[in-house]
Amino acid sequence: MKKIVFATNNAHKLQELRQMLGDRYEILGLADIGCHDDIPETADVIEDNARMKAQYVKDHFGYDCFSDDTGLEIDALNGEPGVHSARYAGPGHDSEANIDKVLKKLDGVNDRTARFRTAIALLQGDEMHMFEGQVEGMILTERHGTGGFGYDSIFQPVEGDGSTFAQMSPEQKNSISHRGRAVARLVEFLNNQQ
């Protein structure tokens, strides 16, 4: 089985990608290659963060790899939290604090349209390839479901049966999610190379 490095230490992301690619690739995380660095994510857009992480791994560890960045963009908040989604509530806060901040900022707001966007950067040799996925939805007024991670319990995709990502099985979520779509494009590209 072919090995590929995914530039993340996020166990939830690794699990999702292993579910999506595990029958074709052995997905290695940063810890698997001995990288325990806190890779900077200082760009203003998710695409550039993904590129920076892939380039960092290549420059410091020598591996071809792919990396991703995801942002939740809420229309009523002018695209916030966007590139800052993982750290929206500030340093040292977790996903629950991020959700609380979103819900507080949207209190009394009727327009709750939003989208998740994922950008995946694949660095092979000196060639960078980008793959993107997006899903439209709504931010609910309270949490629903216990699965998933991040903002999954308050995001209801337009596609589907009215469930939040946190209420869906991993297979349901991956079939319509932003990350699932970006990964599908990555897989198509990788398969065409073989």
PLM ranges: what are they?
Residues K2-V5, A11-Q194:
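Anionic-ligand binding patches
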